[in-house]
Amino acid sequence: LDAISEHYLRQTAGELDTYPRGVTPREEVWRAGNVSLLRFESPEGVEGQPILIVPSLINRWYVLDITEEVSFIREFAQKRPVYLIDWGYPGAEVGHLPLSHYYHRSIRRAVRFMCREHGCDKVDMLGYCIGGTMAYAFSCLEPDMVDHLVLLTAPIDFRDSGIFGTYADHFPTEEFKQSMDFMPGWLLAFSFNFVQPMGTWQKTKMFKDKFESKGFMKLYNAMERWIADPVSYPGKAYYHMLTELYKENLLSQGKLTTAEGLLVDPAARRSKALILNAGKDHIAPLCTTQLPQSDKAPVKQVTIPSGHIGITTGRNSRDASKSALEFIMN
């Protein structure tokens, strides 16, 4: 499926296909179906407790490594060993897997591998968007495996989740469950355009104003390449995300359970957490990033004046990555 996706991308992306998916050198250290674990290159002598990055299931991971100048991963790898879970290009073959397969089994396997490699019993973790939701759920299920937890624009409390909550409330989830093995990536990408209908116009205007800047064009083209690389969402996992998280808000209420019946209990979390949210976020509004009242573990919050994507690639992204790294290192 990865090869098919690559062929499709070459046909549709044109010149953008020549842009790399992530700029920091890396190697794949294990793979299970679509899911793989990547280890990024660090300067000689860099050691310490490894960091696991859990990206969103809804788009490609390399928004966190978009150019040499704008990269969470590159900055982290200067200080610590860095790993990332690459969800690949899921299709019908994984449509039967529940959401907990990703937020528990897959993350646990990655953490165990890292602990064996580095002789440690826990790791530091950063989760972005729904990847942050999954990282948080994992920290509640396996509290002894996570030391520092950075929740980067991660929705946890879905009571007032804005336009995406409205979308989930009106989405025909039961009909989807009966008829679809996955939510097509192209349809998800198309839907996002309607969330901010003026976004394309604003982007075009920005291009007109700044196209003579080489730095701007490098980032602009890299971002367009990322946008042209959509990811499908596994069917059962998508159903669980809409019903258990958005519609029923089970995670925040301490009622979410895995497919095996394990309770995702916020009161069980013991890791030190940083809520790193974005003041202009329309995907994960500030209120959705707050932790449940039953979660009494240490937590601090830093709000960056940017949007959901801008916090990783915009002018304030360096402030965000610096805040995350300082939290982990301290």
Regions found by a protein language model. Name each.
Residues 97-117:
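Alpha/beta-hydrolase active-site loop
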Residues 269, 275-277, 281:
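Short beta-strand/loop motif that positions the catalytic acidic residue
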Residues 15, 22-91:
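Short, surface-exposed "cap/lid" segments of acyl-processing enzymes
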Residues 125-127, 152, 276:
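Short beta-strand immediately N-terminal to the catalytic nucleophile in serine-hydrolase-like folds
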Residues 282-288:
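Conserved alpha/beta-hydrolase "acid-adjacent" motif
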